[in-house]
Design a protein with these regions (language model features):
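Bacterial Sec-dependent N-terminal signal peptides
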Residues: 1-20
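Carbohydrate-interacting regions of secretory-pathway proteins
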Residues: 20-249
Length: 249
């Protein structure tokens, strides 16, 4: 028993002395060196590695589902849904990303609930199936509706942590960090999608797990390509957008 105790004490003492001899330099990691990215002058401005999806001048990077050029109305550096013309989606495909966009719901209030300032940002929209992962856009300023359908919700899945909505007619921001889902070769989910969202600078979704496509009914996953378009929804309301940029992650 004494030998056992002595052996344990020796091991502890040797371990302490040995750890004291470790140089701090041995814990320093120099490679790989992070890529230099020049930030914008404010958090709203696109950094140097961003893909600008709307430059305030044209919708050249957007199309309708039928492949025709986007027909929404452009004015003074922003564009507005043309009700009935159909949703628009990016020509390019994306997976995991950091997405910044600004939106404004109509200053002239019409309707209530889901009929007021309604649109949506669909991440990884699959044209073939009509499915995607929707971040709800809505006028949620003094406009009660079901909580998992208000502004900043993962539609009918996750309620936003708080309601950070501004008044109608004021510009608002979404900063979305999206981690795309991964699928096994047999089409089963290897890793679900996750999303973090800041609404007007306020955290409203904190690494929320997306349970599947946000279409009507119980959400479920279906295997899809690793990159797909982003869609902005025509829900029949005059919602405006500006300053849209994205960083691939």
């Amino acid at each position: 028993m004494k030998k056992r105790v002595l052996l344990i004490l020796y091991s502890i003492t040797f371990g302490i002395l040995n750890s004291q001899n470790i140089k701090y330099e041995n814990r320093e990691v120099w490679e790989p060196e992070p890529t230099i990215v020049s930030p914008g002058s404010s958090f709203r401005d696109a950094p140097s590695d961003a893909i600008v999806l709307f430059n305030g001048l044209n919708l050249n990077k957007w199309i309708h589902k039928n492949g025709e050029p986007a027909k929404w109305d452009i004015k003074d550096g922003y564009f507005t849904v043309r009700p009935g013309s159909g949703s628009i989606l990016t020509k390019d495909f994306f997976g995991s990303c950091q997405l910044h966009l600004e939106f404004m719901t109509p200053v002239n209030i019409e309707g209530d609930g889901q009929n007021r300032g309604n649109s949506g940002v669909f991440l990884m929209y699959n044209i073939e199936t009509g499915n995607g992962y929707e971040v709800q856009v809505l006028d949620s300023y003094n406009n009660r509706t079901y909580s998992n359908g208000q502004a900043g919700s993962i539609y009918e899945q996750h309620i936003p942590l708080v309601n950070a909505s501004k008044k109608p007619g004021e510009w608002q921001t979404y900063d979305i960090i999206f981690k795309a889902p991964l699928f096994n070769k047999n089409g089963e989910v290897k890793s679900p999608a996750y999303v973090t969202i800041f609404h007007n600078g306020v955290l409203i979704q904190d690494n929320s797990e997306i349970k599947g496509f946000t279409n009507i009914g119980y959400p479920k996953y279906e295997a899809h390509p690793s990159k797909l378009p982003i869609l902005l929804q025509d829900h029949g309301n005059l919602v405006s957008f500006r300053n849209i940029w994205l960083r691939e992650l």
